[in-house]
Amino acid sequence: MIKILGRHLRESFKSLGRNTWMTFASISAVTVTLILVGVFLVIMLNLNNMATNAEKQVEIKVLIDLTADQKAQDKLQNDIKELKGIQSVTFSSKEKELDQLVDSFGDSGKSLTMKDQENPLNDAFVVKTTDPHDTPNVAKKIEKMDHVYKVTYGKEEVSRLFKVVGVSRNIGIALIIGLVFTAMFLISNTIKITIFARRKEIEIMKLVGATNWFIRWPFFLEGLLLGVFGSVIPIALVLSTYQYVIGWVVPKVQGSFVSLLPYNPFVFQVSLVLIAIGAVIGVWGSLTSIRKFLRV
């Protein structure tokens, strides 16, 4: 078996060498396609990561009525915790709320510092849901509870965020699927030309008794090699470009939800995906292209 496989592998390399221009055309088609797939894959996965981080930061701010005593606050906290889909309920004192308000204004916020004046803000509960998409429904339920002064969660911002996240994910998936099928079509046609040039050889092999799979194996391996060779340049570009992008972007967005996936193991996972896609494209193109030539 190993001997036969070695023979088929040698035949595949010889065929690639004999049909230099066809080999170049096939590898070029795979390379261009995988570069596009790689770019969109990196963008889509990072957008998905940013969207997930942004979703995690969605929270509900429940302002507690000033008339609520400690017992009423404890009851309100327990009532919120008992709601379905609640991940956490954290108490935030009005002093902490004031500090956050001052910090949000930067240097100009220093003028808001209270000296001898009473803090006018409310104590609050910061609520996070297990599923960020449940935020609007949970907020409506909390609004109806006793001793709740006001509920805020950035309604318009949250709705806009979920729409952007959904659209970006769908567009990314659609583009990658479309590019993969385009690549399969291009490789199939390219390999058909290669096989057509060798149709006499295939017919002779068939006439002398060679089985269909014996004939298919060299083309199977040839397609596999074309796909793998075609993934080399895209992988090199992904490795080098992503490293540069991380070094340039990360320091500028540190601390925000706009965070890129870490270089390792992300780029190596993407590299494996590109190799796999290239191999599948090449094998699929070879097997579908040779099918009609086996009907002698």
Swiss-Prot record:
Give ranges for the Cytoplasmic compartment: 1-23, 192-218, 286-296
* Nucleotide-binding found in the keyword field: no
Where in or outside the cell is it found? Answer: Cell membrane; Membrane raft
Q: Which residues cross the membrane?
A: 24-44, 171-191, 219-239, 265-285
Q: Which GO terms describe its biological process?
A: asymmetric cell division; cell septum assembly; positive regulation of sporulation resulting in formation of a cellular spore; regulation of phosphorelay signal transduction system
* Keyword Nuclease carried by entry: no
Q: What happens when the gene is disrupted?
A: Cells lacking this gene and ftsE, the previous gene in the operon, delay sporulation onset, as a result of which they form a medial rather than polar septum at the onset of sporulation. This is presumably due to slower phosphorylation and activation of the spo0A transcriptional regulator. However, at later time points these cells undergo polar division and eventually form smaller than wild-type mature spores.
InterPro entries associated with the record: ABC3_permease_C, FtsX, FtsX_ECD
Keyword list, A-Z = Cell cycle, Cell division, Cell membrane, Membrane, Transmembrane, Transmembrane helix
Q: How does it sit in the membrane?
A: Multi-pass membrane protein
Gene3D superfamilies the UniProt entry points to: 3.30.70.3040
Q: Which ranges does the record list as Extracellular topological domains?
A: 45-170, 240-264
A cellular-component GO term for this protein: membrane raft
Give the protein family. Answer: Belongs to the ABC-4 integral membrane protein family. FtsX subfamily.
Q: How does it assemble?
A: Interacts with FtsE. Interacts with FloT.
Q: What does this protein do?
A: Part of the ABC transporter FtsEX involved in asymmetric cellular division facilitating the initiation of sporulation. May act as an importer, possibly at the top of a hierarchical cascade leading to the correct temporal initiation of sporulation. Acts upstream of the histidine kinases KinA, KinB and KinC, the RapA phosphatase and the Spo0A sporulation protein.
Q: What is this protein called?
A: Cell division protein FtsX
Q: From which source organism is this entry?
A: Bacillus subtilis (strain 168)
Q: Which gene encodes it?
A: ftsX
